[in-house]
Curated annotation (Swiss-Prot):
This is tRNA uridine(34) hydroxylase. It holds the Pfam family UPF0176_N. It comes from Legionella pneumophila (strain Corby). Its EC number is 1.14.-.-. Residues 123-217 form the Rhodanese domain. It comes from the Bacteria. Belongs to the TrhO family. One of its GO terms (biological process) is tRNA modification. InterPro entries: Rhodanese-like_dom (IPR001763), Rhodanese-like_dom_sf (IPR036873), TrhO (IPR020936), TRHO_N (IPR040503). The lineage of its organism: Bacteria, Pseudomonadati, Pseudomonadota, Gammaproteobacteria, Legionellales. Keywords: Oxidoreductase, tRNA processing.
Protein backbone atom coordinates (compact mmCIF):
# COMPACT_ATOMS: atom_id res chain seq x y z
CA UNK A 1 0.00 0.00 0.00
CA UNK A 2 1.48 3.32 -1.09
CA UNK A 3 0.59 5.42 1.94
CA UNK A 4 3.82 7.44 2.04
CA UNK A 5 3.73 10.75 0.18
CA UNK A 6 7.00 11.99 -1.31
CA UNK A 7 6.98 15.70 -2.13
CA UNK A 8 9.45 17.77 -4.10
CA UNK A 9 9.33 21.55 -4.36
CA UNK A 10 11.36 24.65 -5.08
CA UNK A 11 10.97 28.37 -5.37
CA UNK A 12 13.36 31.01 -6.60
CA UNK A 13 12.87 34.03 -4.36
CA UNK A 14 15.39 36.30 -2.60
CA UNK A 15 15.86 35.13 0.99
CA UNK A 16 18.13 37.55 2.81
CA UNK A 17 17.44 35.72 6.07
CA UNK A 18 17.85 32.17 4.75
CA UNK A 19 20.40 31.21 7.40
CA UNK A 20 17.96 32.00 10.20
CA UNK A 21 15.30 29.73 8.63
CA UNK A 22 17.33 26.55 9.07
CA UNK A 23 16.74 25.76 12.73
CA UNK A 24 12.98 26.48 12.83
CA UNK A 25 12.36 24.32 9.76
CA UNK A 26 14.52 21.46 11.06
CA UNK A 27 12.84 21.62 14.46
CA UNK A 28 9.41 21.42 12.83
CA UNK A 29 10.47 18.43 10.70
CA UNK A 30 11.59 16.59 13.84
CA UNK A 31 8.43 17.58 15.69
CA UNK A 32 6.11 16.28 12.95
CA UNK A 33 8.20 13.27 11.95
CA UNK A 34 9.00 14.46 8.43
CA UNK A 35 12.14 13.03 6.78
CA UNK A 36 13.98 14.52 3.81
CA UNK A 37 16.33 17.28 2.75
CA UNK A 38 15.62 20.99 2.33
CA UNK A 39 18.18 23.37 0.86
CA UNK A 40 18.14 27.10 1.63
CA UNK A 41 20.13 29.79 -0.15
CA UNK A 42 19.89 33.48 -0.88
CA UNK A 43 18.19 32.61 -4.19
CA UNK A 44 15.42 30.50 -2.66
CA UNK A 45 14.45 27.07 -1.37
CA UNK A 46 14.54 23.54 -2.80
CA UNK A 47 13.77 20.19 -1.27
CA UNK A 48 12.28 16.76 -1.09
CA UNK A 49 10.67 15.15 1.94
CA UNK A 50 8.21 12.44 2.86
CA UNK A 51 5.68 11.30 5.46
CA UNK A 52 2.11 10.15 5.79
CA UNK A 53 -0.78 12.34 4.64
CA UNK A 54 -1.41 13.91 8.04
CA UNK A 55 2.27 14.74 8.55
CA UNK A 56 2.61 16.19 5.07
CA UNK A 57 -0.43 18.43 5.36
CA UNK A 58 0.82 19.83 8.66
CA UNK A 59 4.25 20.53 7.17
CA UNK A 60 2.77 22.07 4.02
CA UNK A 61 0.77 24.45 6.19
CA UNK A 62 3.84 25.29 8.25
CA UNK A 63 5.96 26.17 5.21
CA UNK A 64 3.17 28.17 3.61
CA UNK A 65 2.65 30.16 6.80
CA UNK A 66 5.65 32.25 5.70
CA UNK A 67 4.10 34.72 3.24
CA UNK A 68 7.03 34.27 0.87
CA UNK A 69 6.16 30.58 0.59
CA UNK A 70 2.38 30.91 0.52
CA UNK A 71 2.23 29.76 -3.11
CA UNK A 72 4.60 26.81 -2.82
CA UNK A 73 3.69 23.98 -5.18
CA UNK A 74 4.44 20.46 -3.94
CA UNK A 75 4.79 17.72 -6.55
CA UNK A 76 3.74 14.43 -5.00
CA UNK A 77 4.63 10.81 -5.75
CA UNK A 78 3.81 7.78 -3.60
CA UNK A 79 5.54 4.75 -2.15
CA UNK A 80 5.11 2.04 0.47
CA UNK A 81 8.03 3.26 2.59
CA UNK A 82 9.86 6.49 3.29
CA UNK A 83 12.85 6.90 0.92
CA UNK A 84 14.62 9.27 3.34
CA UNK A 85 16.37 8.21 6.54
CA UNK A 86 16.49 11.51 8.43
CA UNK A 87 15.59 15.20 8.39
CA UNK A 88 18.19 17.64 7.03
CA UNK A 89 18.17 21.37 6.30
CA UNK A 90 21.26 22.60 4.45
CA UNK A 91 22.59 26.09 3.74
CA UNK A 92 24.13 26.57 0.30
CA UNK A 93 25.27 29.26 -2.11
CA UNK A 94 22.68 28.02 -4.63
CA UNK A 95 19.62 25.81 -4.27
CA UNK A 96 20.82 23.94 -7.34
CA UNK A 97 24.47 24.49 -8.14
CA UNK A 98 25.30 25.71 -11.63
CA UNK A 99 28.02 28.15 -10.58
CA UNK A 100 26.99 31.05 -12.82
CA UNK A 101 26.38 34.45 -11.28
CA UNK A 102 23.42 36.71 -12.04
CA UNK A 103 21.06 34.05 -13.35
CA UNK A 104 17.59 34.76 -12.01
CA UNK A 105 14.90 32.20 -12.91
CA UNK A 106 12.34 34.11 -10.85
CA UNK A 107 11.72 36.42 -13.81
CA UNK A 108 13.64 35.08 -16.80
CA UNK A 109 12.95 31.35 -17.10
CA UNK A 110 11.99 29.65 -20.35
CA UNK A 111 8.45 29.02 -21.56
CA UNK A 112 6.63 26.28 -19.65
CA UNK A 113 5.04 23.43 -21.56
CA UNK A 114 2.49 21.10 -19.98
CA UNK A 115 3.15 17.36 -20.44
CA UNK A 116 0.58 17.29 -23.24
CA UNK A 117 2.10 20.31 -24.98
CA UNK A 118 5.58 18.88 -24.50
CA UNK A 119 4.54 15.54 -25.98
CA UNK A 120 3.54 17.25 -29.23
CA UNK A 121 6.31 19.85 -29.25
CA UNK A 122 9.27 17.46 -29.06
CA UNK A 123 8.03 15.48 -32.06
CA UNK A 124 8.91 18.47 -34.25
CA UNK A 125 12.20 17.53 -35.99
CA UNK A 126 13.28 21.18 -35.90
CA UNK A 127 13.27 21.24 -32.10
CA UNK A 128 16.56 20.61 -30.30
CA UNK A 129 15.68 18.29 -27.41
CA UNK A 130 18.23 18.61 -24.62
CA UNK A 131 18.57 16.54 -21.46
CA UNK A 132 20.01 18.82 -18.76
CA UNK A 133 20.77 16.00 -16.32
CA UNK A 134 23.96 14.13 -15.49
CA UNK A 135 25.50 11.29 -17.46
CA UNK A 136 24.36 8.50 -15.14
CA UNK A 137 20.79 9.85 -15.18
CA UNK A 138 20.74 9.92 -18.97
CA UNK A 139 22.01 6.34 -19.15
CA UNK A 140 19.09 5.09 -17.06
CA UNK A 141 16.48 6.71 -19.27
CA UNK A 142 15.62 9.74 -21.38
CA UNK A 143 13.24 11.01 -24.04
CA UNK A 144 13.43 9.57 -27.53
CA UNK A 145 15.98 11.51 -29.62
CA UNK A 146 17.20 13.61 -26.67
CA UNK A 147 20.75 14.96 -26.76
CA UNK A 148 23.08 13.84 -23.98
CA UNK A 149 25.34 16.73 -22.84
CA UNK A 150 27.61 14.11 -21.25
CA UNK A 151 28.18 16.01 -18.00
CA UNK A 152 29.12 14.59 -14.59
CA UNK A 153 27.40 17.38 -12.66
CA UNK A 154 25.26 20.43 -13.28
CA UNK A 155 28.20 22.83 -12.99
CA UNK A 156 29.46 21.53 -16.34
CA UNK A 157 26.30 22.50 -18.22
CA UNK A 158 27.26 26.14 -19.01
CA UNK A 159 30.47 24.94 -20.64
CA UNK A 160 28.47 22.49 -22.75
CA UNK A 161 26.27 25.34 -23.97
CA UNK A 162 29.26 27.51 -24.83
CA UNK A 163 30.94 24.69 -26.77
CA UNK A 164 27.93 23.23 -28.57
CA UNK A 165 24.95 25.58 -28.74
CA UNK A 166 26.16 29.16 -28.84
CA UNK A 167 25.63 29.33 -32.63
CA UNK A 168 22.04 28.10 -32.32
CA UNK A 169 20.42 31.08 -30.60
CA UNK A 170 17.62 31.24 -33.15
CA UNK A 171 16.65 27.56 -32.79
CA UNK A 172 13.82 26.12 -30.70
CA UNK A 173 15.40 24.37 -27.72
CA UNK A 174 13.37 22.15 -25.38
CA UNK A 175 14.98 21.22 -22.06
CA UNK A 176 13.96 18.80 -19.34
CA UNK A 177 15.08 17.47 -15.97
CA UNK A 178 13.62 15.34 -13.18
CA UNK A 179 11.38 17.83 -11.39
CA UNK A 180 11.95 21.14 -13.15
CA UNK A 181 14.44 23.05 -11.02
CA UNK A 182 17.51 22.56 -13.21
CA UNK A 183 15.55 23.70 -16.26
CA UNK A 184 14.58 26.89 -14.46
CA UNK A 185 18.27 27.75 -14.32
CA UNK A 186 19.32 26.44 -17.72
CA UNK A 187 16.58 28.30 -19.56
CA UNK A 188 17.22 31.52 -17.64
CA UNK A 189 20.95 31.20 -18.32
CA UNK A 190 20.40 30.65 -22.03
CA UNK A 191 17.99 33.57 -22.29
CA UNK A 192 20.67 35.75 -20.68
CA UNK A 193 23.01 34.60 -23.46
CA UNK A 194 20.51 35.67 -26.11
CA UNK A 195 18.75 32.41 -26.98
CA UNK A 196 15.34 33.40 -28.30
CA UNK A 197 13.23 30.23 -28.10
CA UNK A 198 13.83 28.16 -24.97
CA UNK A 199 11.19 25.87 -23.49
CA UNK A 200 10.98 23.65 -20.44
CA UNK A 201 8.83 20.71 -19.35
CA UNK A 202 6.70 21.98 -16.48
CA UNK A 203 7.34 19.98 -13.28
CA UNK A 204 9.79 17.81 -15.17
CA UNK A 205 9.92 14.18 -16.17
CA UNK A 206 7.92 12.98 -13.18
CA UNK A 207 4.97 15.12 -14.23
CA UNK A 208 5.18 13.77 -17.79
CA UNK A 209 5.24 10.15 -16.59
CA UNK A 210 2.22 10.78 -14.40
CA UNK A 211 0.27 12.57 -17.15
CA UNK A 212 0.99 10.66 -20.38
CA UNK A 213 -0.18 7.04 -20.79
CA UNK A 214 2.72 4.60 -21.01
CA UNK A 215 1.39 3.29 -24.33
CA UNK A 216 1.85 6.77 -25.85
CA UNK A 217 4.91 7.88 -23.90
CA UNK A 218 8.05 9.14 -25.62
CA UNK A 219 10.09 8.37 -22.51
CA UNK A 220 12.49 5.45 -22.81
CA UNK A 221 13.85 3.66 -19.74
CA UNK A 222 13.78 4.64 -16.07
CA UNK A 223 13.95 8.00 -14.30
CA UNK A 224 16.62 8.60 -11.67
CA UNK A 225 15.46 10.27 -8.44
CA UNK A 226 17.57 11.73 -5.63
CA UNK A 227 16.38 9.54 -2.78
CA UNK A 228 16.61 5.90 -1.71
CA UNK A 229 14.24 4.77 -4.44
CA UNK A 230 17.16 5.40 -6.85
CA UNK A 231 14.87 5.35 -9.89
CA UNK A 232 11.24 4.96 -10.91
CA UNK A 233 9.63 3.39 -13.95
CA UNK A 234 6.91 4.84 -16.16
CA UNK A 235 4.29 3.92 -13.56
CA UNK A 236 6.35 5.85 -10.96
CA UNK A 237 7.09 2.61 -9.10
CA UNK A 238 10.53 2.27 -7.55
CA UNK A 239 13.09 0.12 -9.33
CA UNK A 240 16.62 -0.92 -8.48
CA UNK A 241 18.71 -0.33 -11.59
CA UNK A 242 22.33 -1.32 -12.06
CA UNK A 243 24.23 1.93 -11.68
CA UNK A 244 27.70 2.61 -13.13
CA UNK A 245 30.58 1.95 -10.75
CA UNK A 246 31.57 5.63 -10.65
CA UNK A 247 28.07 6.69 -9.62
CA UNK A 248 28.09 9.01 -6.61
CA UNK A 249 24.79 9.65 -4.85
CA UNK A 250 25.86 13.02 -3.45
CA UNK A 251 27.44 14.31 -6.66
CA UNK A 252 24.59 16.62 -7.62
CA UNK A 253 24.04 17.75 -4.05
CA UNK A 254 27.52 19.20 -3.52
Amino acid sequence: MKDIIIASFYKFIPLNDFESLREPILTKMHEIGIKGTIILAHEGVNGGFAGNREQMNVFYDYLRSDSRFADLHFKETYDSKNPFDKAKVKLRKEIVTMGVQKVDPSYNAGTYLSPEEWHQFIQDPNVILLDTRNDYEYELGTFKNAINPDIENFREFPDYVQRNLIDKKDKKIAMFCTGGIRCEKTTAYMKELGFQHVYQLHDGILNYLESIPESESLWEGKCFVFDDRVAVDQKLDRVYPQLPQDYKYEREQK
